[in-house]
């Protein structure tokens, strides 16, 4: 939520922008609430939005995109903190291999995955920087 929060920060008044913030538990539910008129807006990542266009077109048709945030790395693949380095390296290699395997092209297309690269924590610095900027602008918490 750091990129949307940073985009909203200049518009917030005394640290507030929304009358209420609702946590729905999923992007699909957030979009459904916007479509139903029980929420004014929601932040939906572009991959999830594309999947919802494909699988819930009637819901998406009752919404429209207001704005896009700045660019940031896509959502990461994650594993448990306790996963040892050797296993994590094997998992990373398998993901990158699957992302390039021609036999899996149809599956990747179904998930809107163009590929995968090994990311480092520094690759996500833009997300942390957006959080810092939002805090500096007085919008430290989404509200």
Named regions from a protein language model:
Residues 1-31, 110:
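Bilobed "Venus flytrap"/periplasmic-binding protein-like clamshell domains
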Residues 10, 35-36, 40-60:
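A ligand-binding cleft/hinge motif common to bilobed small-molecule-binding domains
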Residues 19-20, 53-71:
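Short beta-strand->loop
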Residues 23, 42-45, 66:
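Short, conserved beta-strand edge motifs with alternating hydrophobic and charged residues
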Residues 34-35, 77:
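Hydrophobic residues within well-ordered alpha-helices
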Residues 72, 79, 85-143:
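An extracytoplasmic/periplasmic, membrane-proximal ligand-sensing/linker region
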């Amino acid at each position: 939520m750091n990129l949307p929060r940073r985009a909203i920060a200049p518009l917030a008044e005394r640290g507030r922008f929304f009358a209420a913030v609702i946590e729905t538990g999923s992007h699909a539910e957030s979009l459904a609430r916007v479509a139903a008129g029980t929420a004014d807006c929601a932040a939906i990542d572009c991959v999830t939005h594309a999947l919802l266009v494909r699988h819930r077109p009637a819901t998406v048709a009752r919404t429209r995109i207001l704005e896009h945030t700045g660019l940031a790395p896509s959502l990461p693949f994650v594993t448990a903190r306790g996963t040892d380095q050797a296993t994590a390296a094997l998992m990373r290699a398998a993901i990158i291999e699957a992302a390039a395997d021609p036999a899996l092209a149809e599956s990747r297309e179904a998930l809107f995955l163009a590929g995968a690269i090994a990311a480092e924590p520094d690759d996500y610095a833009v997300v942390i920087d957006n959080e810092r900027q939002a805090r500096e602008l007085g919008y430290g918490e989404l509200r």
